[in-house]
A protein has these predicted regions:
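Surface-exposed acidic/polar loop and edge beta-strand patches at domain peripheries
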Residues: 1-136, 146-149, 158-272
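Short, solvent-exposed secondary-structure boundary/capping segments
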Residues: 153-154
Length: 272
């Protein structure tokens, strides 16, 4: 595990090789933020099974995923595909056959991970950077299409925050709506709030309807530091939220297509 640290925070980032037992077919193996710890109050992130256990599907901290757009020949019946940031996978068996290799460079304020992947006429390079400045953790991604085929991208972050004492969870800078449901409501304050707490053992998932035209900013209630924030560099597409008794998370998807020779870059600033 790699660690970035200053007087306020320490950030643990999984090592793509040494921490391989923590990876599966879901989350990107480079730039996986496993925990952010406040020097005064302790760990700031959670997970669906945290702190009791860990599994590669649920994860913890701030993982992110490209797994919903596996790359394969559309004419092939083979179950093998390339998952960006993970490697060659067997989709039927839900197994990683060969992990991608990362070049890692760490400085005082950041970690840079770079990999190149090829499969079935797809080719790409992917660079992940995690940087720590004061109380801000920046996670950034650059993807270059170095092959001949367009690369579909359906990526999402999955930051896991601990549940709060009150029912208010997060507030967004974009108008959202959703149907009546058992898990969530829009409070008069503008925050998305819990319903039926503490009966959340099974968890609640809800897609948000929105017509965003600007990049997303999220204010998130936090039991240890009061309020944290996140600023996305992109306009979200599909946008669900999810939580259970241990954690709450929002998942603003980025959906794009990278043409041959094209590169895309985006980032999220997490402010603690």
């Amino acid at each position: 595990m790699y660690t970035l640290q200053n007087e306020a925070l320490s950030v643990d980032v999984l090592d793509p090789v040494a921490d391989r037992e923590r990876f599966g077919t879901r989350y990107c193996t480079g730039g996986y933020i496993f925990q952010v710890t406040d020097a005064s109050v302790g760990p700031l992130l959670s997970g669906p099974t945290y702190p009791d256990s860990f599994n590669t599907f649920d994860g913890q901290g701030i993982p992110d995923a490209f797994n919903q757009s596996p790359l394969k020949d559309p004419k092939s019946t083979d179950a093998r595909a390339l998952i960006i940031g993970i490697g060659r996978c067997d989709l039927e068996k839900n197994e990683v056959e060969e992990f991608c290799s990362w070049e890692v460079r760490q400085t005082e304020t950041g970690i840079r991970m770079h990999t190149e992947q090829e499969f079935a006429h797809f080719a790409l390079s992917l660079t992940r950077e995690v940087e720590l400045y004061g109380r801000t953790v920046r996670s950034s991604i650059t993807l270059n299409n170095t092959g001949r085929r367009p690369i579909p991208i359906r990526w999402f972050p999955h930051p896991f925050y601990p549940q709060t004492e009150g029912d208010e969870l997060c507030r967004l800078n974009i108008p959202v709506s959703f149907p009546e449901n058992d898990g969530y409501a829009l409070a008069d304050s503008g925050f998305i709030a819990r319903k039926n707490w503490p009966h959340w053992d099974k968890g609640y998932y809800q897609a948000l309807a929105h017509e965003a035209h600007s990049n997303l900013v999220v204010l998130q209630k936090h039991p240890a530091v009061g309020l944290v924030a996140a600023t996305c560099s992109y306009v979200p597409n599909f946008f669900p939220i999810w939580g259970n008794k241990n954690t709450f998370s929002w998942e603003p998807f980025l959906e794009r297509s990278a043409a041959a020779g094209q590169h895309l870059s985006w980032s999220i600033d997490y402010e603690f």
